[in-house]
Design a protein with these regions (language model features):
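Short alpha-helical segments that sit at the start of domains
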Residues: 2-28
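Short helix-capping/hinge SLiMs at alpha-helix to coil transitions
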Residues: 20-21, 35-40
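Short, cationic-aromatic polyanion-contact patches
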Residues: 21, 26, 76-97
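A short acidic, leucine-rich amphipathic alpha-helix
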Residues: 46-49
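Glycine-centered, phosphate/nucleic-acid-interacting loop/turn motifs that mediate DNA/RNA or nucleotide
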Residues: 69
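Amphipathic alpha-helical dimerization/coiled-coil segments
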Residues: 91-137
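C-terminal regulatory/oligomerization modules of transcriptional regulators
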Residues: 117-167
Length: 167
């Protein structure tokens, strides 16, 4: 069972993710707990027990996080249940998923097409949305490359464990 401090950390994560990203608090609590739990892979039942929540609440939170690409589900041979863990190698979990910004740019351009004959002031928000999204689409791949090089340097220096070894 987790300690009171670990539950408090999960609660803090729940509030942060609810406030900053509009997630359900349980999804944020689940992310927080998955960041600190041992072992890293947990079943729905284990997570429900640890977080003092129903299995359905955990399953719903896990489905939300899975849809967002923040967790990975796995199942060992012969097991009848999934095990869940944070997937730090997925582009969405690290913030490097450019498709989100491509979709935002496309949506802004769709709006701009509707306002083709409108004055520039009316199009200003959509023009800036498209420009910002295009900027991120262009810059994120290089930033991701820089992050991966930095992460490898931290691992080589022993300052960051290799999470690939702990799957």
């Amino acid at each position: 069972m987790p300690t009171d401090a670990e539950i408090t950390f999960a609660d803090h994560a729940g509030r942060l993710y609810a406030r900053r990203y509009g997630m359900a608090p349980m999804a944020g609590r689940l992310l927080g707990y998955l960041a600190i739990c041992d072992p890293r892979q947990q079943s729905i039942a284990e997570l429900a027990d640890a977080l003092l929540a129903s299995r359905s609440a955990i399953a719903n939170a896990a489905n939300s996080l899975d849809t967002l690409g923040l967790i990975r589900r796995s199942r060992a041979a012969g097991e009848r249940m999934d095990r869940i863990q944070i997937d730090m190698n997925a582009p969405r979990s690290t913030g490097f998923d450019v498709t989100e910004y491509q979709e935002q740019a496309d949506l802004a351009r769709e709006g701009l097409a509707l306002l083709a004959d409108a004055p520039p002031e009316r199009k200003a928000v959509l023009l800036e949305m498209a420009a910002f999204a295009d900027f991120l689409v262009a810059r994120l791949p290089e930033l991701e490359k820089d992050w991966k090089a930095h992460r490898e340097a931290l691992r080589a220096a022993g300052e960051l464990p290799d999470t690939q070894q702990h799957r």
